[in-house]
């Protein structure tokens, strides 16, 4: 995730593509984007294509009211809401920049998942695509020890 005070979302795709993981790795690991029909995702063409017109990803939409079509992404969204609740001023709980967002994402991706046989998403990423894991760590994400994972808003102010 890229911290942004603005929409549209294609700016975040551009940032991931150019700054964070690079064009080649982005195409390899994010060649398909499955999303809901939220307003921030309406400009599929700009999400799919770079400034030079080359394709970066393909965007597909779930059917309306069918969040189950996004599988484990919905579970991750639920975990994100443990840290970043709806109806709360996110700045007031400590989400102020990319560093604080990285803290939240690091804790979520460090927690063991039953559907991954007790492994964390980071552990799976390190095994399946070490190059991507390295880029994520260079971007500022960190693997947190499983017994130190916090999935509450206090993680943003925890020292």
Where are these regions (language model features)?
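Short amphipathic alpha-helical segments
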Residues: 45-47
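A short glycine-/small-residue-rich loop at the edge of a beta-strand within enzyme catalytic domains
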Residues: 3-8, 29, 38, 67, ...
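Active-site beta-loop-alpha junctions of metal-dependent nucleic acid enzymes
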Residues: 1-24
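Short, structurally constrained coil/turn elements
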Residues: 26-27, 53-55
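Charged alpha-helix within mobile-element recombinases
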Residues: 49-50, 56-144, 151, 156-158
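Amphipathic alpha-helical interface surfaces
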Residues: 9-12, 29, 43, 76
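Acidic/histidine-rich, metal-coordinating catalytic segments
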Residues: 25-43, 63-67
């Amino acid at each position: 995730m890229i911290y942004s005070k603005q929409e549209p979302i294609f700016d975040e795709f551009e940032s991931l593509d150019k700054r964070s993981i690079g064009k080649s790795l982005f195409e390899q690991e994010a060649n398909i984007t499955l999303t809901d029909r939220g307003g921030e995702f309406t400009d599929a063409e700009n999400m799919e294509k770079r400034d030079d017109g080359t394709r970066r990803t393909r965007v597909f939409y779930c059917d309306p009211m069918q969040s189950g079509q996004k599988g484990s992404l919905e579970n991750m969204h639920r975990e994100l809401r443990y840290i970043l609740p709806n109806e709360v001023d996110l700045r007031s709980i400590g989400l102020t920049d990319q560093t604080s967002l990285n803290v939240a994402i690091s804790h979520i991706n460090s927690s063991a998942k039953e559907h991954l046989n007790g492994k964390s998403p980071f552990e799976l990423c390190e095994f399946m695509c070490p190059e991507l894991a390295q880029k994520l760590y260079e971007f500022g994400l960190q693997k947190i020890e499983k017994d130190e994972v916090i999935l509450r808003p206090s993680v943003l102010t925890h020292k």
